[in-house]
């Protein structure tokens, strides 16, 4: 835990959004990221709880509490605060196949389960995640990483939506030969053929 008093020293501060009158003029992202030093301060607010409910992702009283992907939230928050961005990206990608769009459209169940939010505002986990993955892209960390050994198994994935592509990615990492089938003329599922393509950049992995 890089800064034990971070949640006491810093109030939650979010990315600044443009006015609605400006937003309706185009489909570009309308939130301006915080300066790097302020984003690191926001990461320092993570309390590194003994039981990190933010990454739990299990049903409590019939409702899912925390990240369903079990993202290692306290770990990469701490790495972000200590200026270890590359390590933070590696930790993020260990559990999340597509943080470039979960950091934009996810409902942030992690923040709803954040212990810091019991008596104040939760840690801005979603925006921290977005900062990390944007750093990874801008610094050239996001490169093809084919497995060193291939198995003799051939697997078909029906549908190229987020779950299908995530499944294909995981199977490919294990060395299997994966073929993705898609009925539409482009891959991405709802991310590219529904309203979300108006709110997400689609010129990266999808």
Regions found by a protein language model. Give the residues of each.
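Glycine-rich FAD pyrophosphate-binding loop
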Residues: 177-187
């Amino acid at each position: 835990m890089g800064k034990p008093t971070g949640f006491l020293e810093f109030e939650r501060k979010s990315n600044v959004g443009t006015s609605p009158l400006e937003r309706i003029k185009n489909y570009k992202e309308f939130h301006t990221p915080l300066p790097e030093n302020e984003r690191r301060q926001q990461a320092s607010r993570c309390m590194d709880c003994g039981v990190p409910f933010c990454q739990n992702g299990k049903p409590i009283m019939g409702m899912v509490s925390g990240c369903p992907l079990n993202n290692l939230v306290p770990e990469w928050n701490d790495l972000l605060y200590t200026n270890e961005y590359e390590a933070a990206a590696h930790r993020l990608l260990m559990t999340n196949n597509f943080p470039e769009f979960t950091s934009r459209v996810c409902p942030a169940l992690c923040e709803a389960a954040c212990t810091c939010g019991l008596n104040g505002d939760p840690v801005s986990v979603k925006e921290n995640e977005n900062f990390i993955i944007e750093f990874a892209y801008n610094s050239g960390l996001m490169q093809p990483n084919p497995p060193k050994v291939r198995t003799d198994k051939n697997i078909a994935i029906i549908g190229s939506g987020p779950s299908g592509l995530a499944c294909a990615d995981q199977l490919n990492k294990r060395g299997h030969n994966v073929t993705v089938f898609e009925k539409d003329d482009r891959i991405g599922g709802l991310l590219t053929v529904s309203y979300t393509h108006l709110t997400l950049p689609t010129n990266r992995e999808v």
